[in-house]
UniProtKB/Swiss-Prot annotation:
Name under which the protein is recorded: NifS-like protein
Binding site for pyridoxal 5'-phosphate: S58, E59, S184, L185, N186
Alphabetized UniProt keyword annotations: Late protein, Pyridoxal phosphate, Virion
GO cellular component, one term: virion component
Cofactor: pyridoxal 5'-phosphate
Pfam family, one: Aminotran_5
Length: 383
């Protein structure tokens, strides 16, 4: 899957089957109920059955769900709650459950993969009298095979099943593999975007006060949902010094990993055309002004992506470089490609944008060219 993502968070090119508003990133321009209904339509869920809660990411959504269910169980009984998780769950699920277990707030069972998927029979065999939640994603994080969520939900009975569904949605398979009791999504409405936690109302009983305090349905300054994210992205501006730091580190990484660096004639940091920037793919040390854009294009649709980007931003086209083979050669996992696809070096980068980019670049600076990326992190040297 190829994506074009701008770091101002206001535009995104993602799979065509997604609704127009999700593709164009119109965050904050309509009432919150509009976006809630969009998510329900995207997932094929009935608005009378599901609550939709916007979060900063699917990682936050997963953590909220796990923490809330465990706490609800502890409020109801003295027995330590038991959580079932799949062997190929995302780190946000496994690390949260393991941390709770270390605090002696729960116990857990890991279901191994059988024929590259989670076997419903194995889930049934793992059920205990104190089982309060099962976390089985729509796809397995390692091999990207689909799990039979509806069958797993049936064997669980009244025990809620929480599923990370981002890969299922982005592969266009949500109709064939719908969620069960609750689901999480990531990176909607732009580069940083927002996450979603969807919960069936029958599973929501007693969870509302444990999620966002009162079970809020949208975002707030402390819970960056649609409107809060939009406000943050449009108001925060980093200094040009930080942008230059990112650029220098980017150049260093590109040379080390033998990527093709593409300075494209466009807008410099002061908003004027960046004269003197070469149109070749040869790295240049110490440019007089920042390039308007650095573009990485993955897959077959480079020309289409080129047209969309430069029509949108009125930037003169230089040359598009397809780096699919390069990405394979240095073994960057596909799920991190979008982080590297499109980096816009202009004054409208936000602090969070820079932190995300810097976390990736600083890691790449410490590994050999055959290394792979860690999970995205927002920690960096920038405060």
């Amino acid at each position: 899957m190829a994506s074009i993502l701008t770091l101002d968070g206001l535009y995104a090119e993602v799979p065509k089957f997604l609704p127009e508003a999700l593709r164009e990133g119109c965050a904050g321009k309509k009432p919150l109920s509009f976006y809630i209904q969009q998510i329900l339509n995207l997932m094929g869920c009935d608005g009378n059955e599901y609550h939709v809660l916007f979060t900063s990411s699917s990682e936050e959504a997963n953590t909220h769900m796990i923490m809330a269910v465990v706490r609800r169980h502890l409020l109801r009984t003295q027995q330590r709650p038991h959580v079932i998780i799949g062997a190929a769950e995302p780190p946000s699920v496994t690390e949260c459950v393991k941390a709770l277990a270390q605090e002696k707030r729960c116990v857990y069972t890991i279901i191994p993969l059988k024929n590259f998927e989670i076997d419903p029979v194995a889930v049934y065999d793992a059920i205990q009298s104190n089982t309060c939640l099962a976390c089985i994603s729509g796809t397995n994080a390692v091999v990207k095979t689909f799990n039979k969520l509806q069958e797993i939900s049936k064997v669980l009975g009244a025990i809620p099943l929480h599923s990370e569904m981002s890969d299922v949605v982005y592969q266009g398979c949500i109709k064939q593999h719908p969620p069960a009791d609750s689901f999480s999504l990531n990176s909607l409405y732009g580069f940083l975007g927002v996450g979603v936690l969807g919960i069936k109302k029958k599973a929501m009983q007693g969870l509302g006060p444990l999620i966002f305090g009162g079970g809020l349905r949208g975002g707030s300054p402390n819970v960056p949902g649609i409107h809060a994210m939009y406000k943050t992205l449009t108001q925060q501006r980093p200094s040009i010094k930080k942008i230059n730091t990112v650029h220098k580190l980017f150049m260093k990484i590109l040379k080390k990993h033998q990527h093709v660096y593409l300075p494209i004639e466009g807008m410099s940091s002061n908003g004027m055309p960046s004269n003197g920037m070469p149109s070749s793919g040869i790295p240049v040390e110490g440019p007089k002004s920042l390039p308007g854009y650095i573009l990485f294009s993955v897959g077959r649709s480079a020309e289409e992506l080129q047209k969309k980007i430069f029509t949108k931003f009125n930037v003169k086209v230089g040359r598009i470089v397809n780096l699919q083979e390069v990405l394979f050669r240095i073994k960057i996992p596909q799920k991190y490609w979008e982080t590297l696809l499109f980096i816009q070096l202009r004054e409208d980068l936000t602090k969070e944008d820079i932190k995300r980019v810097m976390a990736i670049l600083m890691y790449l600076d410490t590994v050999t060219p055959r290394g792979s990326l860690p999970p995205p992190s927002y920690s960096s040297s920038f405060s």
